[in-house]
């Protein structure tokens, strides 16, 4: 948990993102390969697919933070890659996507730490939201959006995990962090 502290803006945003990434990572703890691929809800999302998608997203964000955001429109190839990022291919395993997630996470957090929230940037087109042109932003907008996105993904992972076996992701995070039992939590 990101506990209350007096951090700089960028450190605070980084820690909120990292907290959500810990939840996403913990969501697979104790699952078999088959369970990690199951889609127990009405959507096609699985825990392993959520981890793969998050790693894909982190790689894109890291490139955007380091190299500037691409203002190019989304191509059919880009869209196909995006959709493929939600499902494990037959030749992929949960361990594969966890390794990709861990590598992407380290790079992602380093890119956030090196960013200037007040810096000038450009948000790429987002046609799914009716935005077809690049828009000027401060990097802060993009960093806060990362908190939003990672929290959404952590929430999805939590719901999927609860449907699989009743475990809540916050309890899994605390278990992995070695939090001792208390009146509100038991590992």
Where are the model-predicted features located?
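Acidic/histidine-rich alpha-helical segments that form the ligand environment
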Residues: 83-125, 137-152, 156
